[in-house]
Each structure stands twice: as structure tokens, then as C-alpha cells.
């Protein structure tokens, strides 16, 4: 239960759908990106900037972000903390 996560430049994704945040430099991930593009499952949220993170979703969509994977992971963590705090207020 993560809510919406900002992945840069006003783009947000459903945190619950993301299964991995990875660095795009390896050859297998470059192939994965190319395959997703061919299948119409590539979402480019970089606004023309260098891809610094690849997010893989449970629907096999590949999302490109210009934000570092560590930064996105920190945003996931912060989102989880905020949701936990809000749930504790309700309880």
C-alpha cells in the first residue's frame, strides 16, 4: 500500500503496481526496454533526459525515469511512512 509516487517532472505512478526499480545500464535491461518498446509497453517519463531508472510493473510495463533509483526508493519509503501515520490517526 504505497499510493502515488512522483517519478519526476510531474509524473506519478501507482506504487502498488511497481515490482522493481533498477539501474538501466546493464545489457539485459537494455534488451528488456527494447522488447517493451516493440510490444507497446514502454512508458517514457524522462522528458528527453537521460534514463536513470527503469521501473517494472506487475503488468509488464516498463517505465523510464530520469530520477535515480535510490531517490525513487526513498519516495516509496516516505509514502509508506505517511500512509502508516495516517492509518494510526484513524485507529
Swiss-Prot record:
Pfam families named in the record: RemA-like
InterPro entries: RemA-like
HAMAP family: RemA
Family that this chain belongs to: Belongs to the RemA family.
Protein's UniProt name: Putative regulatory protein Tlet_1629
Amino acid at each position: 500500500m504505497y499510493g502515488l509516487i512522483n517519478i519526476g517532472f510531474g509524473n506519478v505512478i501507482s506504487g502498488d503496481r511497481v515490482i522493481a526499480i533498477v539501474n538501466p545500464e546493464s545489457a539485459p535491461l537494455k534488451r528488456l526496454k527494447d522488447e517493451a518498446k516493440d510490444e507497446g509497453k514502454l512508458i517514457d517519463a524522462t522528458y528527453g533526459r537521460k534514463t536513470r531508472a527503469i521501473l517494472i510493473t506487475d503488468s509488464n510495463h516498463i517505465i523510464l525515469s530520469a530520477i535515480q533509483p535510490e531517490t525513487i526508493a526513498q519516495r516509496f519509503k516516505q509514502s509508506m511512512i505517511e500512509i502508516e501515520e495516517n492509518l494510526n490517526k484513524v485507529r
